[in-house]
A protein has these predicted regions:
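Conserved acidic carboxylate
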Residues: 8
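The feature encodes the CheY-like receiver
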Residues: 14, 56, 74, 86, ...
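Charged docking surfaces used in two-component/phosphorelay signaling
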Residues: 15-23
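Alpha4 helix (beta4-alpha4-beta5 surface) of REC/receiver domains from two-component response regulators
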Residues: 18, 62, 85-101, 113
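Acidic, metal-coordinating helix/loop segments flanking the phosphotransfer/catalytic sites
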Residues: 30-48
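Acidic catalytic/metal-coordinating carboxylates
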Residues: 33-36, 59-65
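Active-site residues of response regulator receiver
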Residues: 52, 82
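C-terminal output helix
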Residues: 106-115
Length: 129
């Protein structure tokens, strides 16, 4: 069982993610904005973060950058969930150090597989040592 922080401002989607991940055996902590999300990450040292790019207070890009610049959080895998599946978004999140980008709506099986893949291959993010 992994501890996962989910940061998503769409509360119905956030609840759906919580149900899917808990059903897959994970401990799930949720946050509806970036400030609460950062607090949850710092307080709980999760194994993985699911992050919507469009959350209040900090956008997802700023959030990834903040996570990668903090020694306590830099090696936590971040999977980005977004409705923006364009090449520019994909390139930018990967350059910032996100492990994966999944486009909404995401199928449950694909999400679980992506999470399991990241949990099975945790390693430091390049250039962020």
């Amino acid at each position: 069982m992994a501890k996962i922080v989910v940061i998503e401002d769409d509360l119905s989607f956030l609840d759906l993610l919580r149900v899917h991940l808990a059903g897959a055996g994970h401990e799930v902590l949720t946050a509806g904005d970036a400030v609460l999300g950062l607090r949850a990450v710092i307080a709980n040292a999760p194994d993985l973060i699911l992050l919507d790019l469009s959350v209040p207070y900090l956008d997802g890009f700023e959030m990834i950058e903040a996570l990668r610049n903090d020694p306590a959080t830099r090696n936590i895998p971040v999977i980005v969930l977004t409705g923006r599946g364009d090449d520019e978004t994909y390139t930018r999140v990967h350059k910032l150090g996100a492990a994966r980008l999944l486009t909404k709506p995401v199928q449950r099986d694909l999400l679980i597989k992506a999470i399991e893949g990241q949990l099975g291959s945790r390693q430091p993010h390049p250039g962020k040592e």
